[in-house]
Amino acid sequence: MSFADVSYDEAMRRARECVPTLLERAQKCEDARVLLPENEKLLHEAGLFRFHQPRRFGGMELPFQAIVDIVAELARGCPSTAWNVGNLGCHHWILGYYEPETQHEVWDANPDVLIASSIALAAGRGRIAKDGFVVSGRWPFSSGVDNSDWNMLAVTVYGDDGKTPVDWRLCIVPKTDYRVIDTWYAMGMVGTGSKDIEVKEIFVPERRALALKLCRGGPGHPGGKLNPGPLFRIPIVASAGHPLSATALGAAEGAFQHVVKSFKTRLGTYTGAKIADFQAVQIKIAEARCLIDSAIALMRDSAVAFQEFAQKNQVPDLETKLRFRAHNALAVRHARQAVEALWSCYGANAIYTRDPLQRFMRDLQAMSQHFSFNFDIAGAGYGTAVMGGTYVNPTM
């Protein structure tokens, strides 16, 4: 099925329509520890994995900010499912940077195909071989891997001495080439199914090994001529946090809506007083709202800016890229702090597993541990660059 004629507004309508069902199934998703097959089916039917797939392959090819808005909307219902939509959906976008032959190989067979990933460059080792690379490694946190037929694995390629890095590749490999190791017993984001992946001495042809240094912005990557639209001129590594951090926005929003709805009618267990009349509660609600609004503004500002740079055929400088990565990290921090504020005034009901607030809280805590959302790391990078220091990342 083609979704090439689906507009941004229609995609958002479809996402909103999915939220009640995702919320209803959120506990089942957590219990299963994977993207539920019925949720996958629901999202396939709505086309919501294909918002950034090139139109020539039947995708929506929506502006970059759609990945923030769609994922955040879905996360109001189930953050784990939304995380997988952002993660698996953005791989349709990244595949658009690969050689045309590889794009056709994957999408001609199945335009709905799901592609997992693990972006830990240090986890994969590669060496140069004739017409490609020989790759080995074990990668953690491959979200949605059980639902996927392919996997994009980050690999550091070493020179003849086996010690000197000479290249950084994102290798797309079929599921027949890797082993899934079930390590995913987590306290939050449980339904993402983010298991380990292992490969041993597999050959990856050049056309399936995307050079990340060619994807730092602009059309000069292998897929640039096939997909000339602005979406495919956005720097991959600099913007890679957006598909995932959007989940934090929606999780915080879902928690906020749940708490406000509860407080409008809830009475204190011991006093019988209306909770909504307590000034301390009112202040916490306002604090949470402002933190969520701040997080949304940070994320949308940088997402829109990435799209605008690309539309003008411009590439943001390193300082700007690092500032936008810091936006990601601070947005997730603000989202987590918002839910912490809600949690602090919600009372003992928050500890029941039947109450969605505890799952939103655990999910935000788990998300905050992601490398990309560590503000000390992201902030140090931007602070170094803006004050004239040297920041080295050959893939940025």
Model-assigned labels for residue ranges:
Residues 17, 251, 258, 287, ...:
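Charged, amphipathic alpha-helical oligomerization/scaffolding segments
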Residues 23, 27-31, 293-330, 343-351:
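C-terminal helix-coil-helix/basic helical segment that borders enzyme active sites and/or dimer interfaces
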Residues 35-45, 50-149, 162-166:
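Glycine-rich flavin
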Residues 128, 139, 154-157, 172-175, ...:
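Short, structured patches in soluble enzyme cores that scaffold and shape functional sites
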Residues 142-183, 193:
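A short core secondary-structure module
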Residues 196-292:
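Glycine-rich beta->alpha junctions and the first turn(s) of the following alpha-helix
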Residues 346-396:
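Glycine-rich phosphate/cofactor-binding loops in nucleotide/flavin-utilizing enzymes
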